[in-house]
Amino acid sequence: QRQMCIRDSVRGMQHVAKLIQDNTSKIVVLSAPKDVTKHLGEVAASFFNRNIEEAHDKITRLEFQFIDFANELLTNDTIKHEAIRGILDCFQAIWKYSMEPFYSTDEKEILAQGELLTSTLLGFYLQEQGMDNSVICAFDFIRTGMNGEADEEYISQKVKEICKAYPNTHLFLTQGSICRNAFGETDYLKQGGSDYTAALIGTAIQAEEIRIWTDVDIHSNDTLVVKDANTIKNLSFSEAERLIYFNPQILHPLCLATAWKENIPIRLLNPMNPTSEGTYISANRLNENMVKAVATKDSITYIRFESNHTLRPYMFISKIFDIFAKYKTMPCLLTSSNDNISVATDDRNFLSLILQELNKYARIWVEDKMSIISVVGNMKSSCIETEARIMDALRNIPLKMISYGSDENDVSLVVKVTDKAEALRLLDEKLLKKAS
């Protein structure tokens, strides 16, 4: 079983090497395999519980696995010895906790070795394949400030300094997620992971584009309902932002926001289909007035508030916003008409308290098991054709809410979960198939 795992890892690293073997200059950001991160987390837990014998057993097993991995991956004896020395150095940073007190904050030091081991081994493999490269440590240039957020000015300065120090190097490898905090301690970026690291580096060097390799494609519809949904080729930043809201697994919002701020395009590529152009996200708005995708969000609660006229209309609206803000509950959609306000939310944590407070000012209707369907594309307010086609497609499906995005990128609707699949099929037939 162990050998099978190693063979899979070897094939995986060889595949990564093929993905980056073109002649363009690049900085490659790498994550540790999930099973390695999980194993290192178990090591940290054993140290924290002072179960030293168990920790030793786990470290030894993983260390031998990495050495076996290097022996199978590499054929050049000199490079192989250097790689094994690099592996032993990383594990020395873990073994030291056998002799030292272990605190919960030390867990990050152990977990970071996964990224360091991965980048070290890939660097040696690429060297053996004749691809000159330099492995640069993220600890040397990725830093967070006192507020825990990425120190973008520092990162930009340091990345440029490192690139200047290697004028003849066109391929750099580094680690995703890991960083130093404001106190110089080993830490992780609070959110965004390797995608965010790539965005920070890409904007620092003003890259031509940021390529994110992910097995989550951006499709024009829910593939569980519409089997032949297409992969979207082009999106504007604002269109992508809307789709990511519905499916954060596509790309972390912080990665998108960072690239958008500096107008650096992002290309999403699937490692299982490396010849595909993927999805290109940029500031360009291609295909005017074209519907790009239909996205959904489930587990929605629909609430309608009808004022009982205890408050004036403007105070009634303000009160609803204030109470939702008080309980840190974000509406997904909101529409208003005179003294009626409709809200759709996916956060039920404090909903009973919110309704209890607002019951003094309004009659309230609540419906669970709803879905939001958002039609995303470049839809200018001057073009009424798309809206008309949406209404025509869904003329036999009850709509609880209709909400227009302020940035002219989407029209969102609230329907019952039981009507969702049929609505998606109708929108695909009437809008997406015709648009393509």
Where are these regions (language model features)?
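A conserved regulatory-domain signal marking ACT and ACT-like small-molecule sensing domains
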Residues: 277-436
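Positions that flank functional sites
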Residues: 141-142, 217-219, 274, 339, ...
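Nucleotide/pyrophosphate-binding catalytic subdomain
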Residues: 3, 7-251, 255-256, 416, ...
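A conserved active-site cap/scaffold subdomain adjacent to cofactor or substrate pockets
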Residues: 239-282, 287-309
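Structural motif
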Residues: 25-28, 67, 109, 132-134, ...
